[in-house]
A protein has these predicted regions:
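Conserved catalytic-core segment of nucleotide-activated headgroup transferases in glycan assembly
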Residues: 168, 177-208
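Active-site and donor-binding regions of nucleotide-sugar-utilizing enzymes
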Residues: 20-143
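Short, aromatic/basic amphipathic alpha-helical patches
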Residues: 33-36, 95-97, 121, 216-225, ...
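A nucleotide-sugar donor-handling region in carbohydrate enzymes
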Residues: 116-184, 300-312, 316
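A donor-sugar binding/catalytic signature common to diverse glycosyltransferases
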Residues: 23-25, 240-281
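Catalytic donor nucleotide-activated moiety binding site of glycosyltransferases and closely related
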Residues: 202-236
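Leloir-type glycosyltransferase catalytic cores
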Residues: 208, 288-332
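Short, basic, low-complexity termini and linkers enriched in Ser/Thr/Gly/Pro
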Residues: 1-14
Length: 332
């Protein structure tokens, strides 16, 4: 369990006890953290890990009880609001709801593959198929890249190696292999040549691979660009927020809804680097097309242009829905 002390509670929400639940991955925890930050409430973040064999079961087949978790003691409190993300976080939320009933308001981020009616509110991106009276859809995924956080990063300026690039660099975010994208050698050849086109146009690059990135890609990026550009080495602190805030343009590989959504928070020209498909990405393709149709993103071809757009700010949309539903629940 961890408490986010940097969360600033608004006067009306100071007494609202908010717990977060996820299996602890950075992406899921950051989605929970982002919603709590947008609400302006202090967050107590719980890592909810299911015992064996329950961790391998779909949520609908798991008993919604504290006993199925490694740390069942964390279910002794009584939060007013629970924000969960991911399969194991969703089961924890369902367990709290089973215990506390209407005394807790449960919000689940992502489709937990159980009826949305099991939660008070479910939040999913528009490209998911889930719909219902208590389902809120957003353009893109919720995240923790708030305007305030980006402004703080801009004020800090370039750090952790970004200083070498000077102003106006291009931020490049690299995901990793999924069931839809292999990140193959031919993908690398095409993508690296597009990056070289930017270098030939006298652009500086801040290349940030992720924990999911293929080690072969990371090694090649270091070899091909590490000398004259910036490539995060997984040793020094990751200047992710600063790279988003300070980059003039952003290039993001197509595999990650979260990274593309976070990049859109900057309202800067955003390019999606498309890779060869292992199979047709139906829902992810809908997400890409929606971002392009909204004028937020364009396909990356090794050239840059200028355009503007308003951030879809899915986190603020979700926070507003939670406030409205909580207010209605309190009145009733």
């Amino acid at each position: 369990m961890a408490v986010d002390n940097d969360q600033q509670a608004t006067r009306g929400d100071q007494l609202l006890t908010c717990w977060g639940a996820s299996e602890g991955t950075a992406g899921m925890a950051n989605q929970v953290r982002g919603v709590a930050l947008a609400l302006g409430v202090p967050l107590e973040l719980h890592q909810t890990i299911l015992k064996y064999p329950w961790r391998w079961f779909p949520p609908r087949f798991i008993p919604w009880k504290p006993e199925v978790f490694v740390d069942s003691a964390q279910f002794t409190g009584e939060p007013r609001l629970v924000i969960s993300c991911g399969r194991q976080g969703a089961v924890a939320s369902l367990a709290w709801k089973r215990q506390l009933k209407d005394r807790v308001f449960t919000v689940n981020i992502q489709d937990a593959k159980v009826s949305p009616d099991c939660f008070d509110l479910v939040c999913v991106p528009e490209h998911d198929d889930l719909r219902g009276p208590n389902v809120i859809t957003t353009l893109g995924a919720v995240h923790h890249m708030s305007p305030a956080r980006l402004a703080e990063a801009r004020a800090r300026g370039p750090v952790h190696g970004l200083e070498r690039l000077g102003p106006g660099f291009v931020t490049v975010l690299i995901g990793g292999p999924t069931r839809l994208y292999a990140f193959s050698e031919s993908d690398y050849q095409k993508f690296s040549e597009q990056l070289r086109s930017l270098v030939r146009a006298e652009k500086r690059l801040a290349i940030l691979p992720s924990r999911r990135s293929d080690p072969r890609w990371v090694a090649r990026l270091q070899q091909d660009f590490g000398r004259d550009q910036y490539v995060w080495d997984f040793v020094s602190p990751n200047p992710y927020c600063e790279a988003l805030a300070l980059g003039s343009h952003l290039v993001v590989t197509c595999d990650s809804v979260s990274m593309i959504s976070e990049a859109a928070a900057t309202e800067k020209p955003l390019y999606i680097a498309y890779l060869a498909e292992r199979r047709a990405p139906r829902r992810l393709g809908q997400f890409h097309r929606a971002f392009e149709a909204a004028g937020i993103a364009r396909p990356f071809d090794g050239t840059l242009a200028e355009w503007t757009y308003a951030s879809p700010d899915p986190t603020a949309v979700v926070a507003a829905a939670i406030r409205d539903r909580l207010r209605a629940a309190t009145v009733s």
